């Protein structure tokens, strides 16, 4: 399949937005986490992303608050500000048997390693992958525009990911960001 190398911000803005239409599970308890990990461990391809509460002070960075792991049908929003990185999560993140596809995964992995060290295996970074198809743009928004012909909304990116409860808008944004990586990867490799 042939793709354009680049897309303008105006062209992306004119595209229809893509939204995850599957089930979203907010994971905040150890029991819910165990169930999510059990389900995810059976998958062979998972969409991957993280969210961090933004800092508006120079030199201050916050810890990752949310880990998104998505199948085509269900996205698990794991609240790392409320739960530790357990052995079960690390088993998934370290597995070569389960492909985890995301954008700019190196930064996400570095952030997760600050919470608990692990060896990342099985990760596919769309920012590297798209170059094989002649795509030069590296943002997820533009990659989605080029490959899927749809835009990913970034309206919730700077919201508070450590809030007591995630809003429906935050949940949809976070789920879409992880899930769309599967859609892009599948279209690229079709």
Can you describe what each PLM-predicted range is?
Residues 1-46, 115, 126, 179, ...:
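N-terminal accessory regions of nucleic-acid-interacting proteins
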Residues 45-58:
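Short acidic, Gly/Ser-rich segments with clustered Asp/Glu that frequently serve as metal-coordination loops
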Residues 48-50, 78-81, 102-105:
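Short His-Asn-centered micro-motif
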Residues 55-56, 108-115:
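Short active-site loop/helix that positions an aromatic residue
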Residues 56-73:
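A short alpha/beta connector and helix-capping loop motif
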Residues 95-100:
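Short active-site oxyanion
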Residues 124-146:
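Short alpha-helix plus adjacent loop in nuclease-associated cores
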Residues 145-190:
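Acidic, Mg2+-coordinating catalytic module of metal-dependent nucleases/exonucleases
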């Amino acid at each position: 399949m042939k793709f354009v190398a680049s897309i303008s911000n105006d062209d992306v803005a004119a595209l229809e937005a893509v939204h995850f239409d599957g089930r979203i599970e907010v994971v905040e308890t150890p029991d819910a986490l165990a169930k999510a990990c059990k389900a995810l461990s059976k998958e062979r391809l998972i969409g991957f992303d993280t969210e961090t509460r933004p800092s508006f002070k120079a030199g201050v960075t916050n810890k990752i608050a949310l880990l998104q792991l998505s199948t085509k049908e269900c996205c698990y929003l794991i609240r790392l500000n409320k739960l530790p990185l357990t052995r079960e999560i690390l088993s998934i993140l370290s597995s070569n048997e389960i492909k985890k596809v995301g954008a700019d995964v190196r930064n996400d992995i570095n952030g997760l390693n600050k919470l608990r060290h692990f060896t990342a295996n099985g990760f596919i970074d769309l920012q590297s992958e798209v170059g094989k198809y002649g795509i030069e743009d590296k943002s997820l928004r533009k990659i989605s525009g080029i490959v899927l012909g749809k835009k990913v909304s970034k309206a919730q990116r700077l919201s508070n990911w450590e809030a007591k409860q995630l809003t429906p808008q935050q949940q949809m944004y976070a789920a879409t960001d992880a899930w769309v990586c599967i859609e892009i990867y599948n279209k690229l490799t079709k």
